């Protein structure tokens, strides 16, 4: 049995009931076979893959808080500090009922390679809780965040582990978490990113993942002699990533015609009105039915169906495993040219393989959605220097980072005989940097 297969079997055996984590490890290691086989004997001797796929530290804790009725509620909190070979742990916090240790480990493992690809000195980690902020009052959200940070603060710091937002954790939650950290530790430092502009946040952080997705996608299209101008684009999601991907796509001349939330989706053949979408989702915090009511050209459909729309480019920006094999078949039948992931692992392995087999350009999330964490690292830089850069300066650095990520991914794919396979290219480019750092630091 090969070393890769041994480690995959070990992960499945030692981490039962964690299918998302199994999927992430399998996808990465399968694509790294060609690299690992070159040094298999040495890697096996150093147990390099075992060290890579096991977190350095895994923290699980209870989070008690009091709701508006005076009832004590108890949730579970997690922080998985996966790999610090190239810098402090860096990765978001997710507050959602679906959160469990397997999902946090999958996200943390992916984060190692994503952070490595940015070229910035940040390691991989992830955290969160099964708390659902939806339907909670501001006071309840604050009570939960303060209790969560009371435990988490023991394990994080500006040079140790710097969490950020993710699903269910926006500016409000980051503010409450930062306030509690400062109160408990007596330190005003860049311990969290995604902060408000009045207390150490970075301009362009909100837009970063969506903008970065389009910078990467555009670089990929240009390398394949395709012009984004005039292309029809299907986008899923209606959160930060989707909204700002739509906005940047329009600025580059593309025509996004869809978006979605947890209850349904919008098809707007005239192109999504991004200002109306921001009003509905960011200001009024309403469902997409409100968008359709205010926009005569828009059609609202319940359930799922974004990928049934005929498009040139598909941007899954909602959640993991949302684009499945049947969706991939529909997209290919409708003539899709490129699929670029805005969310974390939104495409199943089967769907990814089908798209690639049918000549569709595929950008994996660890490369194409790295704009968010890259700009988080730029926020860390500003905090450590006590500086604040302009929007244009941050955006310009982001564009350069994303174009460099594509260039490195493209080069790694070509070097190992996988031209235009950006999944393999991203995994190889991210892996080689982390492994080099791990080897240099010894068996730790």
Give the label of every model feature segment:
Residues 1-203, 433-442:
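N-terminal ligand-binding/catalytic initiation module
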Residues 2, 16-23, 27, 43, ...:
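Conserved active-site and cofactor/substrate-binding residues in soluble primary-metabolism enzymes
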Residues 2-24, 220, 332-444:
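Adenosine-phosphate binding glycine-rich loop
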Residues 104-108, 177, 213-221, 245, ...:
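Buried hydrophobic packing segments
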Residues 160-164, 187-192, 235, 258-261, ...:
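General beta-strand structural signal in soluble alpha/beta enzymes
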Residues 193-196, 201-310:
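Glycine-rich phosphate/diphosphate-binding loop of Rossmann-like nucleotide-binding domains
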Residues 264-362, 367:
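Rossmann-like adenosine-cofactor binding region
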């Amino acid at each position: 049995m090969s070393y890769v297969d041994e480690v995959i079997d070990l992960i499945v055996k030692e981490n039962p009931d964690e299918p998302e984590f199994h999927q992430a490890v399998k996808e990465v290691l399968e694509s790294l076979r060609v690299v690992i086989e070159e040094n298999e004997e040495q890697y096996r001797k150093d147990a390099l893959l075992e060290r890579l796929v096991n977190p350095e530290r895994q923290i699980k804790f209870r989070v008690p808080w009091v709701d508006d009725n005076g009832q004590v509620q108890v949730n579970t909190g997690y922080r998985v500090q996966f790999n610090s070979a190239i810098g402090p742990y860096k990765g978001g916090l997710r507050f959602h009922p679906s959160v469990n240790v397997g999902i946090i480990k999958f996200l943390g493992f992916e984060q190692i390679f994503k952070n490595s690809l940015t070229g910035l000195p940040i390691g991989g980690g992830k955290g969160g809780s099964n708390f659902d902020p939806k339907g909670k009052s501001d006071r309840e959200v604050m009570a939960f965040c303060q209790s969560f940070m009371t435990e988490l603060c023991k394990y994080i710091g500006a040079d140790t582990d710097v969490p950020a937002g993710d699903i269910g954790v926006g500016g409000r939650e980051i503010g409450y978490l930062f306030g509690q950290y400062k109160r408990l530790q007596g330190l005003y430092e860049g311990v969290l990113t995604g902060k408000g502009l009045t207390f150490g946040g970075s301009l362009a952080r909100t837009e970063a993942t969506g903008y970065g997705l389009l910078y990467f996608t555009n670089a990929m299209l240009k390398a394949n002699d395709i012009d984004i101008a005039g292309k029809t684009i299907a986008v899923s999601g209606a959160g930060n990533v989707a909204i700002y991907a739509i906005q940047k796509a329009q600025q580059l001349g593309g025509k996004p015609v869809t978006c979605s939330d947890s209850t349904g989706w919008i098809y707007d053949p005239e192109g999504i009105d991004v200002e109306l979408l921001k009003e509905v989702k960011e200001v009024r915090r309403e469902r997409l039915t409100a968008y359709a009511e205010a926009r005569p050209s828009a059609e609202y459909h319940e359930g799922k169906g974004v990928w049934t729309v005929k498009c040139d480019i598909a941007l899954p920006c909602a959640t993991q495993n949302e684009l499945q094999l049947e969706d991939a078949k529909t997209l290919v039948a409708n003539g899709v040219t490129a699929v670029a992931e805005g969310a974390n692992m939104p495409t199943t392995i089967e769907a990814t393989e089908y798209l690639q087999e049918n000549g569709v350009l595929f950008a994996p999330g660890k490369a194409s959605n790295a704009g968010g964490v890259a700009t988080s690292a730029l926020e860390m830089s500003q905090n450590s220097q006590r500086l604040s850069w302009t929007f244009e300066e941050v955006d310009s650095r982001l564009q350069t980072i994303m174009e460099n990520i594509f260039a490195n991914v493209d080069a790694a794919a070509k070097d190992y005989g996988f031209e235009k396979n950006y999944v393999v290219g991203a995994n190889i480019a991210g892996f080689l940097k982390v492994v080099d750092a791990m080897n240099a630091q010894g068996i730790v």
